[in-house]
């Protein structure tokens, strides 16, 4: 038998534009209805015309989708980056973006969604300050994927408990400028501390599923930080 419905309808806080065709999205809505899921947060990490396209597509089909944008990293290495990126963030918000995500730093800094390139800017870099402060002003939560599970940073040998995943997602710490997991988490926590009025969501348990004691201490000391339990 189908399990009884939960006391409150669940919200899927971490999804992506896995389907971006009308038929696929309508089937998705049918699945949501069948399982009493109230809403899905669609992390597009997009901006500009691509964000507008995805926003119109999803929200034009169902109000179950809340569509989030990304940061415009186009001018990340130029002095005008903060001003230009904030302007685009405001535009996306006016369009209907409910938040920002999923931003990613696995060790080499924020990843540009259009190219997959990691640009060496960690989220505690002052270049992001104006963006995170604008998120606080607009009430836009920020979802950040910091690091990967610890096994992705360990040697690929018989002692690696997560070898089956690590062999596909291994992170080479010999690449110059790469932070290990502790370094990525520290950079993220510094960012959270620097922007106490901004709501942050740490994806995947902040990738500290090997150290819940540390995760608990971080959560206890940062009231503006939430986690999602997606894996």
PLM feature spans:
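Divalent metal-dependent hydrolysis catalytic cores, especially in the metallo-beta-lactamase
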Residues: 10-15, 27-49, 65-72, 98-102
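Catalytic pocket-lining loop regions of alpha/beta-barrel enzymes
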Residues: 117-231
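Conserved, mostly hydrophobic/aromatic
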Residues: 14, 32, 92, 100, ...
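Active-site gating/metal-coordination segments in enzymes
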Residues: 51-170
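Active-site-proximal beta-strand/loop segments in catalytic clefts of secreted hydrolases
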Residues: 13-16, 43-45, 70-72, 102-105, ...
């Amino acid at each position: 038998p189908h399990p009884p419905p939960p006391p409150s309808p669940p919200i899927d806080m971490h999804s992506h534009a896995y389907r971006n065709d009308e038929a696929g999205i309508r089937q998705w809505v049918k699945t949501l209805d069948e399982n009493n899921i109230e809403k899905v947060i669609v992390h597009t990490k997009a901006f500009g015309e691509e964000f507008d396209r995805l926003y119109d597509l999803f929200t034009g089909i169902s109000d179950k989708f809340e569509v989030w944008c990304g940061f415009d990293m186009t001018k990340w290495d130029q002095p005008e980056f903060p001003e230009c990126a904030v302007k685009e963030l405001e535009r996306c918000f006016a369009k209907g973006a409910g938040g920002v995500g999923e931003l990613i730093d696995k060790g080499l800094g924020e990843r540009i969604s259009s190219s997959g390139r990691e640009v060496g800017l960690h989220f505690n870099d002052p270049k992001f300050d104006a963006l995170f402060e604008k998120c606080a002003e607009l009430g836009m939560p920020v979802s950040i994927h910091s690091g990967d599970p610890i096994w992705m940073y360990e040697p690929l040998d018989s002692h690696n408990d997560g070898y089956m995943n690590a062999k596909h997602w291994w992170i080479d710490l010999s690449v110059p400028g790469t932070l290990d997991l502790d370094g990525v988490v520290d950079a993220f926590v510094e960012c959270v501390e620097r922007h106490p009025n901004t709501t942050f969501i740490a994806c995947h348990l902040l990738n500290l599923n090997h150290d819940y004691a540390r995760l608990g201490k971080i959560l206890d000391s940062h009231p503006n930080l939430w986690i999602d339990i997606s894996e």
